[in-house]
Amino acid sequence: MSRLDLKNGSVEMVHGSGGRAMGQLIEELFARALRNQWLDQGNDQAQFELPPGRVVMATDSHVISPLFFPGGDIGSLAVHGTINDVAMAGARPCYLAAGFILEEGFPLADLARIVESMAAAAREAGVPVVTGDTKVVERGKGDGVFITTTGVGVVPPGLYLSGDRARPGDRILLSGSIGDHGVTILSLREGLGFEADIGSDSQALHGLVAAMVEAVPEIRCLRDPTRGGLGNTLNELARQSGVGMQLVERAIPLREPVRAACEFLGLDPLYVANEGKLIAICPAEQAERLLEVMREHPQGREAAIIGTVVADAQCFVQMETLFGGSRMVDWLNGEQLPRMC
């Protein structure tokens, strides 16, 4: 059998048949890019040891369109997204699993580019992809490639973060500017040109999280504001904890190109997706220390205290506007920007 044509070839139904062609796809494309001691064993599962602590598991499916964008692609995004979900528990991400749904006819050159990007992101994060699966669907029944990743990590003993732990008086911190990812994807998808000045913020945040929890283990909760953006995520946390939140608009980091793009498109940046930012809630007396630690890290240089947790049985999130008024930051109704991740 000749080698895969990674320049001009495409995915065929036989690549999902479980036979020789599938083995060739796995060996010459997936295993070569993602190679590590677990994948080299060739098993249908991975066996590994974990350090002491509570085990955390998270899974995330990625259907983003377009597949490639300034600042990343579906491969790196699949790694970053699941690592971040694990890290938001205060955990150290240890291992990843990946499942691919491929559409018949998808160019092998694009698939190789995606898998190599995934491998590079995993290496940079120090979190290997140790097992995986591939399926092929008929032409027209997919959209190129969908990726599901599952991550396993460990929370150090004595640390407990959860979305139901926010208390009145706590401070709300944000690690950086919002809306970059969502505006980048929408601009590229619609051919608007904003992506020339804006790129996705997709990145793995476990290094920032490790620095934060080491310095301030009293952190109540962490959450990454992905789909639905900052507004939806804060409503989720308010509902989980049975509290309200009071935000200050002028304190929320927002880059000028993103602000201008949202204004042009009629979007509220509070609801635009992010892929490399986190929200932290901590006791008021720890907020300045936590802010200092975040700003010392490359991924938190734009960090800010953006609000306060308040007692509110209705769990409303409200915001003091730039003009001194007040507005409700409600749950997002409908889908403002589909297929952002």
From Swiss-Prot:
GO annotation terms (biological process): protein maturation
Pfam families from the UniProt entry: AIRS, AIRS_C
SUPFAM superfamilies listed in its UniProt record: PurM C-terminal domain-like, PurM N-terminal domain-like
Paired cysteines (S-S): none
InterPro entries cross-referenced by the UniProt entry: HypE, PurM-like_C_dom, PurM-like_C_sf, PurM-like_N, PurM-like_N_sf
NCBIfam families linked to this entry: hypE
Family: Belongs to the HypE family.
Reported function: May be involved in the maturation of the NifE hydrogenase.
Name of the molecule in the record: Hydrogenase expression/formation protein HupE
Gene that encodes the chain: hupE
